[in-house]
Amino acid sequence: KKFNFNKPPINAKTGYIDTNILIKSKYILKAANNQNLLNILKSYFECSFKLDWVWAWWSFPSEELAGPQLFHRDYESMNFLKVFVYLSDVDEFNGPHEYVVGSHKVNKLYKRERFADQLIYKNFTKENILTIKGKKGKTFIANTYGLHRGLQPKNEKRLVLVYLFSVIPSNRSPKLPV
């Protein structure tokens, strides 16, 4: 359902921006082809890779949690990384990203489901949980097979852009060339 992101419906938790709009932006494609970024990805993958998908979404303050606001793993592909770009300032009150450091290397809690905080804290120490805050433009890379979530915004909405880079096509890959 389409709505104005400045006036979301009362029950809206998230709002996705149409990928077809994103891929037509020269700025978004230019950022994905930043040579420093590509060098980091090349070093990680040690083989050919491609930009597989790009998407962006708003997260709104809400009484209820949305699925991505619970710890989970992503299963897009066998070998992938995501590049996150905050398009709004993100502090502890408007939905910072949390990542369980080292969880991409272990198969604890590997089922395709969302996990309650208590289960995460039972299997990992609080010191393993990295909270990523930053100003608009903050960019970070994550292997999101590792347990992660975007915290629920409390005061302000959050806008994030995500690039998916993959060695093999993912379940998000376009079926036809873009």
Locate predicted features.
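Active-site region of the double-stranded beta-helix
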Residues: 47, 72-76, 87-96, 102-104
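Short edge-strand/loop segments of extracellular domains
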Residues: 61-62, 100-107, 165-170
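Double-stranded beta-helix
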Residues: 92-147
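Non-heme Fe(II)/2-oxoglutarate
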Residues: 5, 113-114, 139, 145-178
